[in-house]
UniProtKB/Swiss-Prot annotation:
Record function comment: With S4 and S12 plays an important role in translational accuracy.
Protein name in UniProt: Small ribosomal subunit protein uS5
Family label: Belongs to the universal ribosomal protein uS5 family.
InterPro entries in the cross-refs: Ribosomal_Su5_D2-typ_SF (IPR020568), Ribosomal_uS5 (IPR000851), Ribosomal_uS5_C (IPR005324), Ribosomal_uS5_N (IPR013810), Ribsml_uS5_D2-typ_fold_subgr (IPR014721)
Record text on subunit structure and interactions: Part of the 30S ribosomal subunit. Contacts proteins S4 and S8.
Pfam name, any one: Ribosomal_S5_C
GO cellular component terms attached to this protein's record: ribonucleoprotein complex; ribosome
Recorded GO MF terms: rRNA binding; structural constituent of ribosome
């Protein structure tokens, strides 16, 4: 299984005695054979939150249904204020996508897609939206 860390976010809680920091890590797990998992972990330590996110991603693995390394037709998904459009492309074109869409597509083994994002480009929302779009493929 291949692991990718998407984002680490630091959250500060202000209390009477000072500040309390906690960290949220978001990661994806896949095997380049149409399997992908998304996980988020929270902790007061960075490494612990990363470890938790990988464990949750391994538990949430989703199998996608398509044959080759190319998506068969146009896909669209919406999550919160993010809209992701995925268009099939030739092998010559390769991946034309944002950083986070590329990470998701690489980890499932798709290497020729053109994508467009409308609305919010928040990393976590883009990843969730891309996985939603890919899960809409019918066998």
């Amino acid at each position: 299984m291949e692991k990718k860390l998407i984002k680490i976010h630091r959250v500060t809680k202000v209390v009477k005695g000072g500040r309390i920091f906690s960290y949220t890590a978001t990661s994806i797990v896949g095997n380049r054979k149409k399997n992908i998992g998304l996980g988020r972990g929270k902790s007061r330590e960075v490494l612990e939150s990363i470890k938790k996110s990988y464990l949750k991603a391994k538990k949430n693995i989703l199998k996608l249904n398509f044959s080759k390394n190319i998506i068969p037709y146009f896909l669209f998904a919406k999550h919160c204020a993010t809209k992701v459009f995925l268009y099939p492309a030739n092998d010559i074109i390769g991946l034309i996508a944002s950083k986070y869409v590329k990470q998701v597509l690489n980890i499932i083994g798709v290497f020729s897609v053109f994508s467009k994002i409308h609305g919010s480009t928040n990393a976590i929302n883009v990843v969730i939206c891309t996985i939603k779009a890919l899960s809409l493929i019918k066998k």
